């Protein structure tokens, strides 16, 4: 029996409604992360699920690093972003043991390096990765770069050190607050009236004078950071400037990162 014109119109309407219904059923694809490890990474981690941001501030004691982090956390959380902070010697697994070992100066350089790497790996696996998976902004008060620079300044093999930290995630942004050793001395003395044994490189035996040792050691660290900057592409910030100017520069850059760009 031939189809009537009315039936044809009704059929077309049904097909149109079906097509409209199917279009409504389309699921918006999830936002996938572009995270990568520097090397072998951690097995069985789905990088695509790490949708948060990892932001690192590097710099010596007295560089203003902690002050900037406090300001950035307040700013980020005030704008509705959940944040988590990590840093050197904050692992619940080994931080206390590492502190005691340093006080007694009882570890070889290789063992000390492995101790710090364990501290980092524990935080990476149990804090950084779960937080990124939950969509948090992770602020790292120093990362693998300080640990690598310390090892390299103390004569460790460059390739060995690079391999040791190849499990690290590549951050979304890294900022190195570059402050002159002379300025660092003034800031540390103003804050604590003393210089730290390890931050002065006294274990290297360069000189018995702690002030001279501090300047020499921090200069070596500075040179190592600038060398690493070429390989790891992080942003060097003039840390001798006014704290407010640095803060505004960091906020501008981090806003760029939050918009989906990599610094």
Predicted regions and their residues:
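ATP-dependent small-molecule kinase phosphotransfer cores
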Residues: 79-169
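A glycine- and Lys/Arg-enriched "phosphate-lid" helix/loop adjacent to the NTP-binding pocket
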Residues: 147-220
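Hydrophobic "anchor" residues on beta-strands that sit immediately upstream
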Residues: 54-57, 137, 174
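Conserved nucleotide-binding/hydrolysis micro-motifs of P-loop NTPases
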Residues: 90-92, 144-145, 179-185, 243
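Walker A (P-loop) phosphate-binding motif
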Residues: 47-74
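NTP-dependent small-molecule kinase module
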Residues: 2-48, 73, 189-263
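Catalytic metal- and UDP-sugar-binding loop of GT-A-like glycosyltransferases, i.e.
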Residues: 58, 177, 239
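Structural signal for short hydrophobic segments within the conserved structured cores
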Residues: 84, 173, 235-237
């Amino acid at each position: 029996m031939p189809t009537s014109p009315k039936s044809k119109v009704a059929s077309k309407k049904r097909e149109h409604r079906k097509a409209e219904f199917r279009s409504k059923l389309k699921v918006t694809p999830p936002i996938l992360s572009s995270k990568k490890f520097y090397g072998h990474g951690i097995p069985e981690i789905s990088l695509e699920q790490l949708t948060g941001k990892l932001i690192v501030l590097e710099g010596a004691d007295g560089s203003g690093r902690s002050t900037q982090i406090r300001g950035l956390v307040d700013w980020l959380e005030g704008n509705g972003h959940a944040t988590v902070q990590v840093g050197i010697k904050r692992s619940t697994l080994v931080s206390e043991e590492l502190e005691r070992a340093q006080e007694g100066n009882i570890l070889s350089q290789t063992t000390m390096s492995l101790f710090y790497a364990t501290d980092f790996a524990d935080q990476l696996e149990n804090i950084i990765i779960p937080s990124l998976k939950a969509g948090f902004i992770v602020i790292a008060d120093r990362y693998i770069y300080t640990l690598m620079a310390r090892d390299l300044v103390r004569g460790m093999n460059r390739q060995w050190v690079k391999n040791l930290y190849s499990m690290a995630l590549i951050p979304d942004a890294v900022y190195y607050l570059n402050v002159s050793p002379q300025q660092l001395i003034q800031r540390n003395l103003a804050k604590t009236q003393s210089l730290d044994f390890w931050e002065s490189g006294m274990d290297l035996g360069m000189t018995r004078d702690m002030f001279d040792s501090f300047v020499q050691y921090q200069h070596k660290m500075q040179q190592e950071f600038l060398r690493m900057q070429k390989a790891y592409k992080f942003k060097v910030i003039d840390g001798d400037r006014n704290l407010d100017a640095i803060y505004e520069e960091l906020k501008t850059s981090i806003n760029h990162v939050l918009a989906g760009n990599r610094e």
